[in-house]
Amino acid sequence: MSKTGKYYEIDWREEDLRACIDDDFDGDALAVVEAYFANVAKVAEKKPTILGHFDLIKKINGDGKFFDENNPRYTAAANAALMTAARNRCVLEVNTSAAYRGFRKDYFPSDAILKDWLILSGNVVITADAHDAKALTYGFEEAAAKLKELGYTKVQVLGKDGFIPCAL
């Protein structure tokens, strides 16, 4: 997929995402999105217990700066990765870190992805991806309320004997 063989931090600095789009994908930001979700699907094929950072590609895309998150190419790529995750019985991470760090107001994955996931599986876990103690449970109540609004009735909670469902 990569013309240059470089790896890019697509979730931290806008200039890195821009370089990835321009240098490796000839300016086609949605091709980057498709490559990202293809890699998410490859990870899902490995059957991880939790599939995290599902749509991290959107982290620094506030207000559609690089691509349209509602574009059919975006949604098709995301849905293909979701189908792979469902087939492999992954628990999807709902991650509050981008909101905590001020990159976005919403969480990962997007509402649209979470609606589709509810139909396919519905197994989610809320995480903070905390890098400091203040972030440990940041946004959990809001994320739980959002999930409930989207139709979820439970989340998975990791206990000493594995995951257990917890009512919202």
Model-derived features with residue positions:
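Charged catalytic cores and adjacent phosphate/nucleic-acid-binding surfaces used
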Residues: 7, 64-168
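Extended substrate/RNA-proximal surfaces in nucleic-acid metabolism proteins
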Residues: 1-87
